[in-house]
Amino acid sequence: MVVALLTVMPVETAHAQELQVKFNVNSKQVEGSDKSVFDNLKETVEQWMNDRQWTELQFQKNERIAVTFNVTVVKYDKATNMFECTALIQANRPVYNSAYTTTLYNNKDDNFNFQFAQFDQLNFDDETLGSQLTAMLAYYAYLILGLDLDSFAPLGGTEVLQRCMNLTNNAQSLDFGGWKAFEDSRNRFAIINDYLDEAMKPFRQLQYDYYRLGLDEMANNAERGRTNISTALETGLKKAHEDKPLSLLPMIWTDYKRDELANIYKGKGTQKEKEAVYNILFGINASQSEAWDKVRN
């Protein structure tokens, strides 16, 4: 992923751009509006995010992080160019030595509100932010890049994640929801603030232990990879939940890892290992008990 890992990939020209973004806009709830503004929004955002260099790192073209924004427009006011939306943001990471991709991040933003006029040019820097739209897009770019880098080296995304935190602090003055400190336990502030909290360091370490030592290893040695994942769930996920029980990050993570975890353990591993994993997952997220039952089978 980062420069040190490029040597294992096929030799080709390195590209600066890190993201491959799809920005899907569902405007069915605002029927009667001119659809061209929604098409232009999609095209403008995708071009801006995909052409921008977010870090100094060099990425191979086939290493760019796939990110999808599924945006639902709830209300649109043409007179003020105001969009009220929800967005489901998902990022995927390739698993090395396999054709499998794994979900790196998946979460809903219920305050994805912004102003955009057709043919607007997007401008941004970390200090002035530019606009609510570019601030949100940059927030998710930095967050996802930080998660990705954490998955390739222990705490490897610290610098990028700090940029995300600084952006969030600067966005406190924006007159839009989702940024305010301690207003909501799963808004944009809460996600990055919790992730960088010292008490959540085990959760950050989990990213490396789960992906690099676990999933990436499974293609070579499934038994060793799964054992490493079991250890990561104990020392990373469980410990983070114990150290900061009010953080929703472990629960959000288990929500989007539900099916993957069930598949990793279903019919595999010792019963003792499976019971230990089940107890961790059920203790954090009992609402997914149906999936956790598969872990024990």
Give a label for each model feature.
Residues 28-35, 123-131, 243:
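Second-shell loop/turn segments in exported
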Residues 11-16:
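Sec/Tat signal peptide C-region and signal peptidase I cleavage site
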Residues 79-192:
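Acidic/His-rich structured neighborhood in mature extracellular/periplasmic domains
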Residues 1-10:
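Bacterial N-terminal signal peptides
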Residues 24, 211-297:
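A cross-kingdom marker for long, charged
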Residues 17-84, 95-97:
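Start-of-domain marker
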Residues 46-54, 146-150, 262, 266:
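Sec-exported extracytoplasmic/periplasmic mature domains
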Residues 156-246, 250:
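Flexible, glycine-rich surface segments
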